[in-house]
Amino acid sequence: LIVFSGVGKTRAEMEIALSGGIRQFNVESEPEMQLLSEVAMKMGQVAPVTIRINPNVDAKTHSKISTGKKEDKFGIPILRAREVFAMAADLPGLKVVGIDVHIGSQLTELEPYGLAYEMVAELTKVLRADGHEITRLDLGGGLGITYKNINDTPPTPEEYAALVCEKVGHLGCQIEIEPGRFIVGNAGILVSEVIYVKSGEDRNFLILDGAMNDLIRPAMYGAYHEIVPVEQPLDQINYENYDVVGPVCESGDTFATVSYTHLTLPTT
């Protein structure tokens, strides 16, 4: 069963999802809700929806992957949740089944989750009192993993599960989570070949055959990914620092810079 999230769902995508028996749409805005109602009515179907709320909680992660603060593009401001849920209940072709929340990615603390889930629990009670049948809670994901310091200890799945049970377990809802990164974040390796070693005026470059189109996170927001040589260098060899870059004709096509002072590779 598929849950359809995202702030920019198109009419065509909605039609395909409804035709395929989608589990639910996580609706992000009133215009999206109105379009989905129109599409569902035209197809003679009822679209199951959760409505994503924005709790204005700082996930304490990189700003580029924060999704639950008021300045972020995601969800309905929680202060307007009752109004929007009432609007959804009046639209034909929609069946409101729950609440969706997602505050960010690569979270390394449980506290932000706790704050957001407490708000979800309270909102669930309020919406039920308003007559809405809230049976599902999509709590998002974002549980962090270790990228750099092997001594880092992000929350474990067991600790996260205990928090979920504590904050929303008493509500009797179906719980949906999106573990994503925690499952697959360390499952892949990008292997690239050094094409050229280049000396600039104030730095050295290792130019790879891999680029930001293969792994965009470092170029996009400075994400850290460990870089190791496929073949270990010989002992007692001179080392220098290098910028590890790709061949794309943009200066942002960089995997690591001299700010990663541990990144030393052998001279040729």
Per-segment meaning from a language model:
Residues 1-136, 145:
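Active-site-proximal beta-alpha core segment in soluble small-molecule metabolic enzymes
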Residues 163, 171-263:
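Charged (often Lys/Glu-rich) extended helix/loop segments that serve as interaction or gating elements
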Residues 57-61, 134-151, 176-177, 181-188, ...:
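Flexible glycine/acidic-rich beta-alpha junction loops that bind and position SAM and/or redox cofactors
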Residues 264-268:
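A short, hydrophobic C-terminal helix/tail in secreted or cell-surface proteins
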Residues 116-172:
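Acidic, glycine-rich loop-and-beta core segments that form the ion-binding/anion-interacting portion
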Residues 109-116, 146-159, 185-196, 259-260:
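Short glycine/threonine-rich loop-to-helix capping motif typified by GTGT followed
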